[in-house]
Amino acid sequence: MSSSTSCPIPGCRDQLPDGYSTTPGGTLYATTPGGTRIIYDRKFLLECKNSPIARTPPCCLPQIPGVTTLPAVPPSKLELLKEQKQTEVEITDDEQFEMDM
């Protein structure tokens, strides 16, 4: 019988190091779920960033006011500054239950 130890898999992006799957030259390595290795060169990635397709918003986005579309009427500054009234619940000194002695 052989014993093996397990290594926890990072589940959150915060746990991964900054230079994960990169080289000092800026080349980025990735794999697909099928196992195909993909190599992205730094120059190619910078060209993709400045391409017209990268600057075009995606089609068929849902209409969410304030997120994907501008709101029809911007909220007035007074509405933003208004404080919400909070209802205060009176705390009574009554006993919560009766105690037999």
Curated annotation (Swiss-Prot):
<dbReference type="GO" id="GO:0005634">
    <property type="term" value="C:nucleus"/>
</dbReference>
<dbReference type="GO" id="GO:0045947">
    <property type="term" value="P:negative regulation of translational initiation"/>
</dbReference>
<feature type="short sequence motif" description="TOS motif">
    <location>
        <begin position="97"/>
        <end position="101"/>
    </location>
</feature>
<keyword id="KW-0810">Translation regulation</keyword>
<keyword id="KW-0963">Cytoplasm</keyword>
<feature type="region of interest" description="Disordered">
    <location>
        <begin position="1"/>
        <end position="28"/>
    </location>
</feature>
<keyword id="KW-0539">Nucleus</keyword>
<protein>
    <recommendedName>
        <fullName>Eukaryotic translation initiation factor 4E-binding protein 3</fullName>
    </recommendedName>
</protein>
<keyword id="KW-0597">Phosphoprotein</keyword>
<dbReference type="GO" id="GO:0005737">
    <property type="term" value="C:cytoplasm"/>
</dbReference>
<comment type="subunit">
    <text>Interacts with EIF4E. Interacts with RPA2 (via N-terminus); the interaction enhances EIF4EBP3-mediated inhibition of EIF4E-mediated mRNA nuclear export.</text>
</comment>
<comment type="function">
    <text>Repressor of translation initiation that regulates EIF4E activity by preventing its assembly into the eIF4F complex: the hypophosphorylated form competes with EIF4G1/EIF4G3 and strongly binds to EIF4E, leading to repression of translation. In contrast, the hyperphosphorylated form dissociates from EIF4E, allowing interaction between EIF4G1/EIF4G3 and EIF4E, leading to initiation of translation. Inhibits EIF4E-mediated mRNA nuclear export.</text>
</comment>
<dbReference type="Pfam" id="PF05456">
    <property type="entry name" value="eIF_4EBP"/>
</dbReference>
<dbReference type="GO" id="GO:0008190">
    <property type="term" value="F:eukaryotic initiation factor 4E binding"/>
</dbReference>
<dbReference type="InterPro" id="IPR008606">
    <property type="entry name" value="EIF4EBP"/>
</dbReference>
<comment type="similarity">
    <text>Belongs to the eIF4E-binding protein family.</text>
</comment>
<keyword id="KW-0652">Protein synthesis inhibitor</keyword>
<feature type="short sequence motif" description="YXXXXLphi motif">
    <location>
        <begin position="40"/>
        <end position="46"/>
    </location>
</feature>
